Amino acid sequence: MGFDLATDLAARRRQHRYRQARIMDGPSGRHALLGGRQYLNFCSNDYLGLANDPAVVAAFQQGAADWGVGSGASHLVCGHQRPHQQLEEALAAHTGRQRALLFSTGYMANLGVMTALLSKGDAVFQDRLNHASLLDGGLLSGARFRRFPHNDGQALASQLARSEARRKLVVVDGVFSMDGDEAPLVDYAEACEGHDAWLMVDDAHGIGVLDAQGRGSVFTQGVNERVPVLMGTLGKGLGTAGAFVAGSDELIETLIQFARTFIYTTAMPAAVASATLVSLRKSREENWRRDTLAELIARFRQGARALGYTLMPSQTPIQPLLIGSDVDATALSEALREKGFLITAIRPPTVREGEARLRVTLSAAHEVEDVDALLAALAQCQTQDV
């Protein structure tokens, strides 16, 4: 058949799974401007409301004035500028680790770690609901790829016990991006320690949000010193862009030498690093942002439960409404959009068959009135049989 792309695209349309980017005409914050209309935005990952914070924006502008809008090269050529170094040192201190290394995206960080640490003869063990970048990194590493049931520490321990691999790496999300629940990191740390394995945690959705200082899930669960590899992103709780890996001096040196996604790509703009230095400090010091989030999460969950919606076991800003069919999830998303709310319907293959959902995300930029308005709109959709 060759490259029959039209057939593939037509099939995706029939499945109600055709993706299209919406062109936003303003910044992504509490509100979103789309097609000349302003919406309340409940699908951004800007959990702490830092993406449009005046101090963070000012730091970005000053960074661009001082360092230009591009780094000009990879880190190992001439693209590693002073703000990059300062941010790596700040992230290492923030996460209680010897060193940290910047990557352009979380996807590249995850691919870089696994392809640098693993090869044929090794094994990687992953939660079935891990992010696509973790799954791709495991497959690309050349290691034997094993998946265990979601959040099942006993199943993981059993797989580790049977493995005779040279190196064993367990990889999990700290907070799962589509369900919002947290991994049982204590169970995983114990399983790894009992079977000579390393634990890697992708805390993309925990950094900035969890822990009294925003240090993430490894701190809330008390396992930071038991997790050799920590990955975090800068574009969610911290409001900027990019990612980092934090760990021992030997780990970071290994990534510098062998992580192709670090070596062979242009460094992030120094202006982004400058802005992140400010957002990192604010995320650590401004506890009111996490307090606001906790209040909004509790209010939304109570209201959605009272309306009869099926919630996931999440206490994080990710609050999915489990709908079921792709058609119903899309219809509810569109109905809410007509009422002035922007919430994306998440469908397979991102989530499992029959588990399409509305991924509601809350931000410290939201007001209590915003959550109440969303709950009222959901109630109206029920009366309109949507």
Swiss-Prot record:
Q: Which GO terms describe its biological process?
A: biotin biosynthetic process
Cofactors (names): pyridoxal 5'-phosphate
Q: Does the keyword GTP-binding apply?
A: no
Highest taxon above the source species: Bacteria
Q: Which InterPro entries match?
A: Aminotrans_II_pyridoxalP_BS (IPR001917), Aminotransferase_I/II_large (IPR004839), AON_synthase_class-II (IPR050087), AONS_Archaea/Proteobacteria (IPR004723), AONS_Proteobacteria (IPR022834), PyrdxlP-dep_Trfase (IPR015424), PyrdxlP-dep_Trfase_major (IPR015421), PyrdxlP-dep_Trfase_small (IPR015422)
Q: Membrane-spanning residues where? A: none
Tell me the route in metabolism or biology where this protein functions.
Cofactor biosynthesis; biotin biosynthesis
Locate the residues binding substrate: R19, H131, T350
Q: What is its EC number?
A: 2.3.1.47
The record's section on Pfam families has:
Aminotran_1_2
Q: Which enzyme type, at the first EC level?
A: transferase
Give GO MF terms, alphabetically.
Answer: 8-amino-7-oxononanoate synthase activity; pyridoxal phosphate binding
Which keywords does the record carry? Biotin biosynthesis, Pyridoxal phosphate, Transferase
- Family label: Belongs to the class-II pyridoxal-phosphate-dependent aminotransferase family. BioF subfamily.
Q: Which NCBIfam families has this protein been placed in? A: bioF
What is the protein name given in its UniProt record?
Answer: 8-amino-7-oxononanoate synthase
Species for this entry: Alcanivorax borkumensis (strain ATCC 700651 / DSM 11573 / NCIMB 13689 / SK2)
**Lineage start:** Bacteria, Pseudomonadati, Pseudomonadota, Gammaproteobacteria, Oceanospirillales
